[in-house]
């Protein structure tokens, strides 16, 4: 059996193990004793290390911040840094996000590509090297982090308590290797002139704000003007309602990862762009026509700030 045939023969086993990880809701939770990122990430780490144990690897849990599976010998360590925590799920799933679902040649579930699936791919690659007797002059250490999505405190802890890595990569992007990434800016914007009464949209900073609801004061024929303006945008859905002297604007754009904003439509950005000509309703730093990645998680009407 050649290596490609052997990889294929392991696919069912790997998918079964992926299902075990996908079934765990490993979003950032409430810290508890011995569980710095809450119950879910700790449970996912326990299961990930258990799978590695079953495959015959040495495993170590570093205080539920992260853990690792290791093979090989030598003083130098090649690190493979993945993560088991996930971003919030949202409400528009076709399939159960916590159940691995197969549809043709695709599988669906939260974490299948970011980053539970890639962790297992790396683990099974290590298994194949070991089982084929490949002798390495370095150790290979697969690190399973629990906080990549919300600050990478898992890796900060690793650097404090574990051996330094000689080199490494993360299976959390496209192949071939990417040597650098775009930067991010997290900020709070204040405005003296905004007339926004409330604004909510988005659920995580590294994803496009694909839905947004904004409330502003109603004015003569403003509802009709906004409806006409929104009809010419790339929104999937929009609705403007008027009640008790207020306009509620709902917009549904197109979701996309923050690294590929050109593939999505920012609902908050569209509302801002189309409302601005009719009054100083929004003065957020969102790129016009909804191509920016900014998102208003909440709006503080008293302080006039977008958070």
Region locations from a protein language model:
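N-terminal helical capping/dimerization or prosegment-like subdomains
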Residues: 1-81, 87-89
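Class I S-adenosyl-L-methionine
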Residues: 46-56, 123, 130, 224-234
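Active-site metal-coordination/substrate-binding segment of hydrolases
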Residues: 54, 77-144, 150, 161-166
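Short secondary-structure junctions
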Residues: 54-62, 102, 196, 237-240
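General beta-strand structural signal in soluble alpha/beta enzymes
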Residues: 60-63, 109, 142-144, 169-171, ...
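Short, internal active-site loops enriched in acidic
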Residues: 65-67, 146-150, 254
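Hydrophobic residues embedded in beta-strands of well-ordered beta-sheets
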Residues: 67, 106-107, 247
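Midchain, well-structured core segments that form catalytic/ion-binding scaffolds
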Residues: 149, 155-307
